């Protein structure tokens, strides 16, 4: 709305109630605080928010863009956040189920810098059947490190099977290792 004459210049729609709305000094971005605790970062030249920023308990954060890419200081352990797929609307999938394809470290800065992230595939094409994982044993070694033996079993789903394609190890919600090596530090 132009303040000079009250004419509507642009019309935006967002779901949920807003608690506060602030425009940046350069008039290029609206920051919207929502009732559910999100901050929407909405460039005024776009028809949708660029990203949502959420503060989580225990100094956690979550940044999510409109296509599902996310960043967090606890990328695989945010119980209050889940994926709900159109073909299984009553089944909430944990965030880590899509970590390989949608976790993007530094997402906030990358989006603000104008980086355009390419979707790896459509969500409906992703194999969402998790394997069965059991901790078999935990042994403390003489060097103070722990040796953990896990058993991973394939699980058959309606249209796919699970398997173990990427292995990620978390300790207290923090990602501490990857396998295979091309995704990060080898275990």
Predicted features by range, described:
Residues 26-28:
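Short coil/turn segments that connect the beta-strands within blades of beta-propeller domains
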Residues 140-144, 151, 156-187:
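Long, low-complexity serine/threonine/glycine- and acidic-rich segments characteristic of extracellular
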